[in-house]
């Protein structure tokens, strides 16, 4: 289980590497990814996350991996700027209406509720077999 903010500097390097590693071993890993944007540090991450959810709900693949390729100022607050960069990188046409849909908001809120229930307060946070992995590297030791 991974909780991550797409604009967190450590997440940008960690998450794509970890996900790619785990994808190569589908018999060993089931990846559960939860969006956990840290709004106070990276306000732009909230809209980026909602855009990613909207695109996933439309059936797009590899959204999570590509999300970490979106380069936007973490402090950006103009939704049109955030969405334009997201759509450019993803080659998509997500709109503000998509971000505000009840389905997207429900999914987004659910991710935050799961994080809250597990007392996640930072990113990236990794649980391996139900145990918090503070090193974030134990996945490489799975046999």
What are the language-model segments listed below?
Residues 1-3, 34, 48:
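Acidic/histidine-rich, surface-exposed loop or edge segments in extracytoplasmic proteins
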Residues 27-32:
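A fold-wide structural signal in alpha/beta-hydrolase
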Residues 38-123, 127-143:
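Cysteine-centric redox/oxidoreductase cores and disulfide-bonded domains
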């Amino acid at each position: 289980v991974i909780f991550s903010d797409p604009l967190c500097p450590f997440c940008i390097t960690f998450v794509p590497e970890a996900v790619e590693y785990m994808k190569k071993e589908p018999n060993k890993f089931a990846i559960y990814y939860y969006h956990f944007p840290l709004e106070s540090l990276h306000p732009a991450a909230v809209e980026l996350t909602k855009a990613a959810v909207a695109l996933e709900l439309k059936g797009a693949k590899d959204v999570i991996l590509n999300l970490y390729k979106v380069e936007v100022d973490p402090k950006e607050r103009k939704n049109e700027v955030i969405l334009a960069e997201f759509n450019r990188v993803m080659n998509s046409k997500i709109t503000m209406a998509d971000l505000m849909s009840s389905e997207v908001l429900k999914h987004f809120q659910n991710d935050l509720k799961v994080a809250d229930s597990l007392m996640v307060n930072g990113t990236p946070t990794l649980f391996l077999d139900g145990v918090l992995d503070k090193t974030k590297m134990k996945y490489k030791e799975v046999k």
